[in-house]
Swiss-Prot record:
Keyword Protease: no
InterPro entries: Seed_Storage_Prolamin (IPR051529), Zein (IPR002530)
Annotated function: Zeins are major seed storage proteins.
Taxonomic classification: Eukaryota, Viridiplantae, Streptophyta, Embryophyta, Tracheophyta
Family membership: Belongs to the zein family.
Top-level taxon of origin: Eukaryota
PANTHER family assigned: ALPHA KAFIRIN (PTHR48199:SF1)
Organism from which the protein derives: Zea mays (Maize)
Tissues where this protein is expressed: Expressed in developing endosperm.
UniProt keyword terms in alphabetical order: Repeat, Seed storage protein, Signal, Storage protein
Residues annotated as signal peptide: 1-21
Protein name: 22 kDa alpha-zein 16
């Protein structure tokens, strides 16, 4: 009985599948060239439908809304750059007369002033900018001092009120104190060479040689008391003053640095 029931169920399943099945006719395999004949009317009807038109309008509005902020940002950035350029040109025109006069009188200072406009620190605080430029001149010497004796280097930067208030002046004073012994030996051995070594590197000596010699006498007076040779050297400085001024005007007469390793 069970076998017969299973056979009947299998026959019923075959009959049901046969009634639901369909056969694809070969005429459906028509060439693709004949299909587009029926598409244009359907496509035009679809575009004329209100729902499709509303969807297309929504897409167009979204595209225009996305493009509008980008164009506005580009216009704002161009306007901002234009305003910055105009402001910079106006500032340069204000300083052109004084800068032209400065270029004739002192070209080095003129070049330094030209860099002020391109430096944010110079625009905010000119004094701090100039102090930074002076510190950069002493950086090689400070680097050597930090490598040779770090303790002295740290002491120079932290232990003196002058170092905190005016670091370039303090560093210059400390460097002069370090080279005074070597300069004293050079002054005793060859006073003319000593003066030639100091004059080109001292602004006071270039502008006013008499005041410079007076300053050097005040510095070396304690040494003159202890060493008569130094007192004799100080007297020779006054005699060599015309020669030193002439050597400043003629670089060919300036001797090379003696004992350059000391500096």
């Amino acid at each position: 009985m069970a076998t017969k029931i299973l056979a009947l169920l299998a026959l019923l399943a075959l009959l049901v599948s046969a009634t639901n099945a369909f056969i694809i006719p070969q005429c459906s395999l028509a060439p693709s060239a004949s299909i587009p004949q029926f598409l244009p009317p359907v496509t035009s009807m679809g575009f004329e439908h209100p729902a499709v038109q509303a969807y297309r309008l929504q897409l167009a509005l979204a595209a225009s809304a996305l493009q509008q902020p980008i164009a506005q940002l580009q216009q704002q950035s161009l306007a901002h750059l234009t305003l910055q350029t105009i402001a910079t040109q106006q500032q340069q025109q204000q300083f052109l007369p004084s800068l032209s006069h400065l270029a004739v009188v002192n070209p080095v200072t003129y070049l330094q002033q030209q860099l002020l406009a391109s430096n944010p620190l110079a625009l905010a605080n000119v004094a701090a900018y100039q102090q930074q430029q002076q510190l950069q001149q002493f950086m090689p010497v400070l680097s050597q001092l930090a490598m040779v004796n770090p303790a002295v280097y740290l002491q120079l930067l932290s232990s003196s009120p002058l170092a905190v208030g005016n670091a370039p002046t303090y560093l210059q004073q400390q460097l002069l104190q370090q080279i005074v012994p070597a300069l004293t030996q050079l002054a005793v051995a060859n006073p003319a060479a000593y003066l030639q070594q100091l004059l080109p590197f001292n602004q006071l000596a270039v502008s006013n040689s008499a005041a410079y010699l007076q300053q050097r006498q005040q510095l070396l007076n304690p040494l003159a008391v202890a060493n008569p040779l130094v007192a004799t050297f100080l007297q020779q400085q006054q005699q060599l003053l015309p020669y030193n001024q002439f050597s400043l005007m003629n670089p060919a007469l300036q001797q090379p640095i003696v004992g350059g390793a000391i500096f």
